[in-house]
Amino acid sequence: MAANRDYYDVLGVSRDASDAEISKAYRKLAKKYHPDLNHEAGAEEKYKEVNEAYEVLHDPQKRQQYDQFGQAGMNGQGGFGGQYGGQGFGGADFGDFGDIFSSFFGGARQQVDPTAPQRGADLDYTMTIDFMDAIKGKTSEISYSRSTTCEVCKGSGAEKGTHPITCDKCGGSGMMTITQRSVLGMIQRQTTCDKCTGSGVIIQHPCHNCHGKGVKTQKQTLQVKVPAGIDNGQQIRLAGQGEAGKNGGPYGDLYIVFRVRPSKDFTRRGQTIYTTVPISFAQATLGDEINVKTVYGDTKLKIPAGTQPNQKFTLKEKGVPSLRGGSTGDQVTTVEIVIPKSINEAQRKALLEFVKASGGSIAPQEKGFFERLKEKLS
């Protein structure tokens, strides 16, 4: 990460921010700098920076180590980089560098109860919709896969009529403390229990339905209401439609990111719709009333006499509705004066009379080779 920026500063959160606040900040920044959505210079590097910060701060173990030792605690094992990491100093295993200081100064790692309820993970779903559906809204059905709590064991992972038992090796903590000799003396380090693999419990009789996992992967079908006015890259949250939680914890959420197909008739920027309509020289000069397409159907537009090329006209409340309700945007229509590539003799004479009446003149065009040849032969 550039200049070893503080991870908390990268995510824009305080050092005592909760896991929920960190996740919320990450999701917002990841969306802002995602290379598929942001093509500005430096966006991809910023996206990597945000991911690096989140990778550390959302993990309780890595976050504690970072809080104690900063960037040094993230290099190698326990902050010793290069040749002194891991098995440096004659083969002494430093493991988690934070535990060395814990053993000297009486500190203790804040442990998370592995049997406590844990919220399920969030899911993302990309939904592609038509331009008009983004303007007016619609209801659409989606299908996706997610883990759901096993209906047989209710998430315990144990066969019906049995229960998980506390791991006798780690006492239910999911962690083991190992004492080792080092050049600094006797040190202690913590590692995941190899018997219960960190769960804190042993399932002697696994559930036949979920094979002891407590969850099953299933296909989920939902009716999604696309809000009128949604824009490309925006998202909505469907609470409780993510992955199943653990130990009775709540489900995560489902975030639906919208991709809007472009329109051949309209361009959108925010709540404003932009269009271009062709008019003739005569219409621009004399004025007229024309039909103009809008996202709500055709409407009349009065072209005043003397309209200039690329002149813009605003059609009030013919744009995009606000997602939060309230006012609707406008449509800006630009007129393009079309000059004919060829005209007949009557039109040419009329234009020359127009020029003459305006006090101007038109230099006669030089005749082409075939016209001159025709005159000589006649």
UniProtKB/Swiss-Prot annotation:
Cofactor dependence: Zn(2+)
Q: What is the annotated role of this protein in its UniProt record?
A: Participates actively in the response to hyperosmotic and heat shock by preventing the aggregation of stress-denatured proteins and by disaggregating proteins, also in an autonomous, DnaK-independent fashion. Unfolded proteins bind initially to DnaJ; upon interaction with the DnaJ-bound protein, DnaK hydrolyzes its bound ATP, resulting in the formation of a stable complex. GrpE releases ADP from DnaK; ATP binding to DnaK triggers the release of the substrate protein, thus completing the reaction cycle.
| Binding positions for Zn(2+) 1 per the UniProt entry | 150, 153, 207, 210
Positions bound to Zn(2+) 2:
167, 170, 193, 196
- Summarize subunit and interaction data from the UniProt record for this chain: Homodimer.
Regarding domains, what does the record say? Answer: The J domain is necessary and sufficient to stimulate DnaK ATPase activity. Zinc center 1 plays an important role in the autonomous, DnaK-independent chaperone activity of DnaJ. Zinc center 2 is essential for interaction with DnaK and for DnaJ activity.
- Listed GO MF terms: ATP binding; heat shock protein binding; unfolded protein binding; zinc ion binding
Q: Where in the cell is it found?
A: Cytoplasm
NCBIfam families from the xrefs?
DnaJ_bact, PRK10767.1, PRK14276.1
CDD domains, alphabetized: DnaJ, DnaJ_C, DnaJ_zf
A Pfam family this chain is assigned to? DnaJ_CXXCXGXG
The protein depicted here goes by the name: Chaperone protein DnaJ
How many and how are cofactors bound here? Binds 2 Zn(2+) ions per monomer.
Query: Does the keyword section mention Nucleus?
Result: no
Residues of the J domain: 6-70
Underlying gene: dnaJ
What is the species listed in this Swiss-Prot or TrEMBL entry? Lactobacillus delbrueckii subsp. bulgaricus (strain ATCC 11842 / DSM 20081 / BCRC 10696 / JCM 1002 / NBRC 13953 / NCIMB 11778 / NCTC 12712 / WDCM 00102 / Lb 14)
Record has Chaperone as a keyword: yes
Alphabetical GO CC annotations of the entry are: cytoplasm
Q: Where are the zinc fingers (CR-type)?
A: 137-219
